[in-house]
Amino acid sequence: METYVLSDRRLASVEAWQEAIDLAGLPLRMSQATPFSELQGALPVVLERRPTAFECDHCDAKELMAELSEVAFDRPWTFALAFRWGADVYAGASAYAAAAAYALATDGVILDCEEAKLISPERAIEISRELAQSEALIHEAVRRVMELYQNKSQP
């Protein structure tokens, strides 16, 4: 899965990005091992004390917008930052939270490829929280099923 932030300016560093995350009140800590300008591939993060990672890459905004002609972009953008993740729900939640903070800090917009439309940073934060919560619900459901199974197998 993937999402993008389109903006007309870039943050100077991962540290500045972390400040934007903190300002938004999001429970996300980003690795600062790779300079922002060199981000390409897996970016280790911790969401609510849980380590995970998502891919983060700089993209050509003009090329991206040309490829996605079905999306109603409100105007041309200068920069694009890609966020990609697989089946790890916390990676997805982290990517949405990081994208939201980045968009807020750069006055950018978020392209949600799942919905094939632009979404607000506030909506990205909602999606992040929904994903993180769904993981907890899944674990609770599995725990209950295991408990029922164990109780039925005992004499």
What spans do the regions from the language model cover?
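Acidic (Asp/Glu-rich) sequence patches and key acidic residues
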Residues: 1-155
